[in-house]
């Protein structure tokens, strides 16, 4: 999440080594967490000591939508401010494939599931914050030319559908008439926390509390809506 800021800092201060470092970090993270289905798992343990880590690959066992949402936003935010050259070519291709994979997993209702790659999992649900993150990443990638042609059209369609679904189904008025953004998973992680061990299985991600008005959902929704306004200019 911090790498787009590192890149901008490197650009502003004339320190290209910071940009090169950020690109290496992106590439390493993608290589270590890539899933056979074209998405990215939540975590990686080089030591393989954590119980959630696959003993062969070190990867966690499930694809959590919000983790992919953070990744998609970071990749898009970084690439739209970098030159389209050989230094970023591989990362751009990986990002295009990721965005295509996200579009392919959008539900008919326009949102995305908490466990992203398993819509049929019992108890799985459409999660607000990841859906807002994906809407932002798709709309921004299309608006600023990271995606072109049919890819851009598909991203615009998916992003607009997601934003409309969020505004129509996830904003609810409370008893005082205040609009609340609902359906946001509060937090999820891996390993020990607060006396519990988070094992990273698909079922684990369905046990975390779902809340309203968490900044991790409100912020991306505002960002996605801003992209829609910029596209309408």
Curated annotation (Swiss-Prot):
Induction: By certain acidic polysaccharides found in carrot root extract. This induction may be regulated by the polygalacturonase. It comes from the Bacteria. InterPro entries: 6-hairpin_glycosidase_sf, 6hp_glycosidase-like_sf, Glyco_hydro_88, PolySaccharide_Degr_Enz. The keyword Hydrolase applies. GO terms for molecular function: hydrolase activity. The keyword ATP-binding does not apply. Keywords: Hydrolase. SUPFAM superfamilies: Six-hairpin glycosidases (SSF48208). GO terms for biological process: carbohydrate metabolic process. Seems to regulate the surface properties of the bacterium in the presence of plant cells or plant cell extracts. Mutations in this protein are responsible for an increased aggregation of the bacteria in the presence of pea root cap cells. Belongs to the glycosyl hydrolase 88 family. This is Protein Atu3128.
């Amino acid at each position: 999440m911090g790498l787009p800021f590192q890149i901008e800092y490197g650009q502003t201060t004339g320190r290209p080594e910071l940009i090169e470092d950020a690109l290496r970090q992106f590439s390493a993270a993608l290589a270590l967490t890539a899933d056979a289905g074209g998405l990215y798992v939540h975590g990686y343990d080089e030591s393989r000591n954590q119980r959630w880590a696959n003993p062969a690959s070190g990867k966690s066992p499930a694809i959590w939508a919000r983790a992919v949402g953070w990744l998609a936003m970071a990749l898009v935010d970084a690439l739209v401010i970098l030159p389209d050259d050989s230094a970023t070519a591989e990362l751009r291709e990986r990002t295009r494939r990721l965005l295509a994979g996200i579009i392919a997993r959008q539900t008919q209702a326009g949102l995305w599931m908490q466990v992203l790659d398993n819509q049929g999992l019992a108890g799985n649900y459409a999660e607000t914050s990841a859906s807002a993150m994906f809407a932002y990443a798709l709309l921004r990638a299309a608006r600023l030319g990271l995606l072109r042609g049919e890819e851009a059209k598909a991203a615009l369609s998916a992003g607009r559908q997601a934003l409309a679904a969020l505004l129509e189904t996830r904003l609810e008025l409370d008893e005082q008439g205040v609009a609340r953004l609902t359906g946001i998973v509060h937090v999820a992680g891996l390993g020990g926390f607060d006396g519990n061990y988070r094992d990273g299985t698909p079922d684990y991600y369905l046990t975390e509390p779902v809340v309203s008005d968490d900044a991790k959902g409100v912020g991306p929704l505002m960002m996605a809506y801003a992209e829609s306004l910029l596209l309408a200019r």
